[in-house]
């Protein structure tokens, strides 16, 4: 491999902005902030959403009622299943 063309791979602490949940993973991202986590100092990357706050992983997922075209037409013009 050529020297000097690859980014530095290091362990980084990611912190969920919504919940404060932290986890360490390898990354090439750089940060000027650092944080103490589990006895070590890591660069800190703040993320808006992670597995700790995402509805899919937390089980608090909400499903929107997706009406099809026919249902919207029937609702708009007052047709119901009894007619």
Swiss-Prot record:
Keywords: Ribonucleoprotein, Ribosomal protein. The keyword Manganese does not apply. It holds the Pfam family Ribosomal_L31. InterPro entries: Ribosomal_bL28/bL31-like_sf, Ribosomal_bL31, Ribosomal_bL31_B, Ribosomal_bL31_sf. Transmembrane segments: none annotated. GO terms for biological process: translation. One of its GO terms (cellular component) is ribonucleoprotein complex. Binds the 23S rRNA. This is Large ribosomal subunit protein bL31B. It comes from Lactobacillus delbrueckii subsp. bulgaricus (strain ATCC 11842 / DSM 20081 / BCRC 10696 / JCM 1002 / NBRC 13953 / NCIMB 11778 / NCTC 12712 / WDCM 00102 / Lb 14).
């Amino acid at each position: 491999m050529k020297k000097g063309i690859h980014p530095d791979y290091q362990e980084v602490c990611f912190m969920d902005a919504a919940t404060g949940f932290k986890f360490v993973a390898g990354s090439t991202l750089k940060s000027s902030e650092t944080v103490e986590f589990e006895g070590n100092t890591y660069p800190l990357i703040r993320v808006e959403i992670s597995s700790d706050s995402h509805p899919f992983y937390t089980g608090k997922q909400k499903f929107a009622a997706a009406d099809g075209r026919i249902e919207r037409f029937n609702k708009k013009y007052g047709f119901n299943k009894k007619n």
